[in-house]
């Protein structure tokens, strides 16, 4: 197995992307590993050590030092070390974030919102939100306005509730005159002087008209009851006959009422002439 050359200039170190301290650490690990490989007779893992040293120095570009890119053996070595595995995960996350900036911005907004919600609200008035102060003062202002408007509304109700007082008091002479007039009307009614119709309209005629009205109403009810008891085929003829009877009685009643009105009309000029 050919022995690897441990020496390197500062230019090569800068090309590899390694600082001076990391390069010395790499050389120590290289010598130790080479001695172990000589004893065990296995292959050289110089490329894996270069990648590990690059990750330890947090230089992302130093992973390109190994020619041909990292092979399966390098990945296995890196994943076997816990701190290297973490660095690889962070690098993969950065690549994903670069490819999808929208998801990264959404994640940032979620983190910012969570921080805002986590901030406790201070009880002091100096650090409190002015919007919350205005909302807290609104109900107080409403209460004050209601209290101011209540006495005004009460005064208006009191003014409306007091009715206008009218004086219904009259003299004793007026009351006595009204009493005499009512008594004279009552005496005229009892003596027969007070009549609804003229002198030509007798009480018998008025009673006749009243009897005819009652008879007509009673006949209407009786005919309607008989009509319901009849079958449907005979109801039409019965209703026609009942209608004729009612019309004849109504004509008789109308004529008697007209006679009363004519007698009253004749009585009016007689009274005016006398």
Swiss-Prot record:
Keywords attached to this entry: Chromosomal rearrangement, Coiled coil
- Site (Breakpoint for translocation to form NUP98-CCDC28A) at 76-77
Locate the coiled-coil region(s) and give their ranges. 234-263
Question: Would the keyword Coiled coil turn up in this protein's UniProt record?
Answer: yes
Q: Pfam families from the xrefs?
A: CCDC28
Q: Where is the composition biased (Polar residues)?
A: 122-138
Keyword ATP-binding (UniProt): no
Where are the residues of the annotated region Disordered? 121-166
Q: State the associated disorder.
A: A chromosomal aberration involving CCDC28A has been identified in acute leukemias. Translocation t(6;11)(q24.1;p15.5) with NUP98. The chimeric transcript is an in-frame fusion of NUP98 exon 13 to CCDC28A exon 2. Ectopic expression of NUP98-CCDC28A in mouse promotes the proliferative capacity and self-renewal potential of hematopoietic progenitors and rapidly induced fatal myeloproliferative neoplasms and defects in the differentiation of the erythro-megakaryocytic lineage.
Q: What is this protein called?
A: Coiled-coil domain-containing protein 28A
Species in which this protein is naturally found: Homo sapiens
This protein's encoding gene:
CCDC28A
């Amino acid at each position: 197995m050919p022995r690897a050359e441990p020496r390197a200039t500062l230019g090569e170190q800068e090309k590899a992307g390694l600082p001076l301290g990391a390069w010395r650490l790499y050389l120590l690990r290289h010598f130790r590993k080479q001695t172990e490989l000589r004893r065990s007779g296995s292959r050289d893992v110089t490329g894996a050590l270069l990648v590990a040293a690059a990750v330890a120095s947090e230089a992302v570009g130093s992973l390109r030092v190994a020619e041909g890119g990292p092979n399966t053996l390098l990945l296995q070595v890196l994943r076997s070390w816990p701190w290297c595995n973490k660095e690889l995960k962070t690098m993969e996350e950065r690549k994903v974030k670069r490819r999808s900036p929208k998801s990264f911005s959404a994640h940032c907004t979620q983190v910012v919102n969570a921080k805002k919600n986590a901030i406790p609200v201070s009880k002091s008035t100096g650090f409190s939100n002015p919007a919350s102060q205005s909302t807290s003062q609104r109900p107080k202002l409403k209460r004050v306005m209601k209290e101011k408007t209540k006495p005004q509304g009460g005064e208006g109700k009191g003014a409306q509730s007091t009715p206008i007082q009218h004086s219904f008091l009259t003299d004793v002479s007026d009351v006595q005159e009204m009493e005499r007039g009512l008594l004279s009307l009552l005496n005229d009614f009892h003596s027969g002087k007070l009549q609804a119709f003229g002198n030509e309209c007798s009480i018998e005629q008025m009673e006749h008209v009243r009897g005819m009205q009652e008879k007509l109403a009673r006949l209407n009810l009786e005919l309607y009851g008989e009509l319901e008891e009849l079958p449907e085929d005979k109801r039409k003829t019965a209703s026609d006959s009942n209608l004729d009877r009612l019309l004849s009685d109504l004509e008789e009643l109308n004529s008697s009422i007209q006679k009363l009105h004519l007698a009253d009309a004749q009585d009016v000029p007689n009274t005016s002439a006398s």
